[in-house]
Amino acid sequence: RTKISTYLTIPCGNQSLCVDRVVSDNTGRLSSVFVGGVYPLFRGASNRVLLAFASPQFQSSYLNSLELSEEEKTQLKEDLKGARARGYDITHNRLTEGLFAVGFPIYNSANQLVAGLSVGGVDDSERPDVVEKYIQQGRQLAVEINNQMGSNYYSRISD
């Protein structure tokens, strides 16, 4: 519907599982994310949003399990904090070189985090208007899905 690539992931232990994807013609050949694929939570927008909106206890345990430098862990913590404050995460070249994505949390009727939704396309840092379009379209999709799931998450936050 958005004519951009869309991915849906769910938490799967300390990783995420891609359960659905719709890829556009311009990103399909580049995408390294496939239905049934398992991915690290700290790479890719639909994965990182699962980590950003997870409980502080889970985040801490997960971050401590990563084999990253302290500097990388500190940067990741700041990125996750920013994503949570914005209500979405944005990544450039994190999971697939040449692509960017914007990830949004999906909640169920009990307002429990159940999935991550990302929309993305070819990375063009010279066109911030394109990124903003993806943010708006992704947010609209996330709101619709959350509403259909019975969640009031997006009615509780401001744009």
Regions found by a protein language model. Give the residues of each.
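Intrinsically disordered, low-complexity terminal regulatory regions
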Residues: 1-23, 133, 137-159
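Alpha-helix boundary recognition
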Residues: 51, 64, 81-84
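A general structural signal marking secondary-structure boundaries and capping sites
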Residues: 54-57, 87, 149
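Short, hydrophobic secondary-structure boundary micro-motifs
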Residues: 61-63, 92, 154-155
